[in-house]
């Protein structure tokens, strides 16, 4: 069957659900697709379809990231359902890095939990520009004063981590109520909170200014072989435009730079003439084997970015209370540096006269990675150790 062409008639926004495990992120995602489907603006995706990798079902927690799409009157949304479990925060980082805005899901009976804090902190680190809160399971709360208290606590928490806590819309509702409703009338009360939430997302999360005019760059998230067609890499275009036929370079995870041409671009299984900044696309590459490319590399306009191993870094080291280290580290410390879509081990050098770094410190250091990756001034990264984030940083200067 011939593929449909993707219609670009509304602004496109990448959004995602974040929050503590079992607070209702996946239920809400399903409820949004259901409510929008009743208005003819989405395909309904059931809970099981979103929570769909094999290991997820067995343990009842979302591990991988699911993509759904829906529309409101004003916009087209690509929605990622981000993992909520602390062990899988690494995936959370890959998801949060792809967001123009986030829906923070908080269970009203439970209030903010450790992962709620960690996700707000991470959203700040990876610079999610705006957030809307869905206060879920309010049907399980009888006391309106308790609801007010949970809301106040949330606003304080958001403010603490650098978000405008007083301004952020908090929508109260029940995702399960909407998902379980037998009614096919979208104006019924059980769908009201979902409509309100989408209105808040439409109004409060700004349409991002896409970096369309900058040179093309796309971090590679995944690589597939398609029989008879070649190798496809997927990811979200960080900046610029890629057109079918463009020559591009594959950079990172080693010193060599490969040159290839893009022979096809797809989004949501539909063909595009070009992919633009902010689009989640698959790009078909000419003459490239499945083994020639890997997650962590980038596709880029020739000459626009180079692989580097050594740079200066301005780093904030998380406190113990924020989920960071309990003890200091010293020169020669070798954590993982989470750059764009992958972890790379690197050694840290501290400035002269600084013997150790304490949790909570802000410090400038030098970093030397064990393999070159595509790095440029202003690049943000996370520092991770044993599966948890211990710091966040930015590259003010490249050394080598």
Curated annotation (Swiss-Prot):
InterPro entries: EF-Tu_GTP-bd (IPR041709), EF-Tu_GTPase (IPR050055), EFTu-like_2 (IPR004161), EFTU_2 (IPR033720), G_TR_CS (IPR031157), P-loop_NTPase (IPR027417), Small_GTP-bd (IPR005225), T_Tr_GTP-bd_dom (IPR000795). Residues 10-209 form the tr-type G domain. Pfam families: GTP_EFTU, GTP_EFTU_D2, GTP_EFTU_D3. Residues 60-64 are annotated as: G2. It is found in: Cytoplasm. Gene3D superfamilies: P-loop containing nucleotide triphosphate hydrolases (3.40.50.300), Translation factors (2.40.30.10). Residues 81-84 are annotated as: G3. Its main location: cytoplasm. GTP binds at residues 19-26, 81-85, 136-139. Residues 174-176 are annotated as: G5. Its EC number is 3.6.5.3. GO terms for molecular function: GTP binding; GTPase activity; translation elongation factor activity. Residues 19-26 are annotated as: G1. It catalyses: GTP + H2O = GDP + phosphate + H(+). Mg(2+) binds at residue 26. Residues 136-139 are annotated as: G4. Keywords: Cytoplasm, Elongation factor, GTP-binding, Hydrolase, Magnesium, Metal-binding, Nucleotide-binding, Protein biosynthesis. GO terms for cellular component: cytosol. GTP hydrolase that promotes the GTP-dependent binding of aminoacyl-tRNA to the A-site of ribosomes during protein biosynthesis. Monomer. Belongs to the TRAFAC class translation factor GTPase superfamily. Classic translation factor GTPase family. EF-Tu/EF-1A subfamily. This is Elongation factor Tu.
């Amino acid at each position: 069957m011939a593929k449909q062409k993707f219609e670009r008639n509304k602004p496109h926004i990448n959004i995602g659900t974040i929050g503590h495990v079992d607070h209702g992120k996946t239920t809400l995602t399903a409820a949004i697709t259901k409510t929008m489907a009743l208005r003819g603006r989405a395909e309904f995706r059931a809970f099981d379809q979103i929570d769909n990798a094999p290991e997820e079902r067995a343990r009842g927690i979302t591990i991988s990231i699911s993509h759904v799409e829906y529309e409101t009157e004003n916009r087209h949304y690509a929605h990622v359902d981000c993992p909520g479990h602390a062990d899988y925060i690494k995936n959370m980082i890959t998801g949060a890095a792809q967001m123009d805005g986030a829906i923070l899901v908080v269970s009203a009976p439970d209030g903010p939990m450790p992962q709620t804090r960690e996700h707000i902190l991470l959203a700040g680190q990876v610079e999610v520009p705006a957030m809307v809160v869905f206060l879920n399971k309010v049907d399980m709360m009888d006391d309106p004063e308790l609801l007010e208290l949970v809301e106040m606590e949330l606003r304080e928490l958001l403010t603490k981590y650098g978000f405008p806590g007083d301004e952020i819309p908090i929508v109260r509702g029940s995702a399960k109520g909407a998902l379980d409703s037998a009614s096919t009338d979208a104006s019924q009360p059980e769908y009201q909170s979902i409509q309100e939430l989408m209105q808040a997302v439409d109004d409060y999360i700004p349409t991002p200014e896409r970096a369309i005019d900058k040179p093309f760059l796309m971090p590679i998230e995944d690589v597939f072989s398609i029989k008879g067609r070649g190798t496809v890499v997927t990811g979200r275009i960080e900046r610029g435009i890629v057109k079918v036929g463009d020559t591009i370079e594959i950079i990172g995870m080693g010193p060599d730079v490969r040159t290839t041409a893009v022979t096809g671009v797809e989004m949501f299984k539909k063909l595009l003439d070009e992919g633009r900044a902010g689009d989640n696309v698959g790009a078909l590459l000419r003459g490239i084997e499945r083994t020639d490319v890997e997650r962590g590399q980038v596709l880029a306009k020739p000459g626009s970015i180079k692989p580097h191993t050594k740079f200066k870094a301005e780093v904030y080291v998380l406190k113990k209370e924020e989920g960071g280290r309990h003890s200091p580290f010293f020169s020669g410390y070798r954590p993982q540096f989470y750059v764009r879509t992958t972890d790379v081990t690197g050694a840290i050098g501290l400035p002269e006269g600084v013997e150790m770094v304490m949790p909570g410190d802000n410090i400038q250091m030098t970093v030397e990675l064990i393999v070159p990756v595509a790095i440029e001034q202003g690049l943000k990264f996370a520092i991770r150790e044993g599966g948890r984030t211990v710091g966040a940083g930015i590259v003010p200067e490249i050394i080598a």
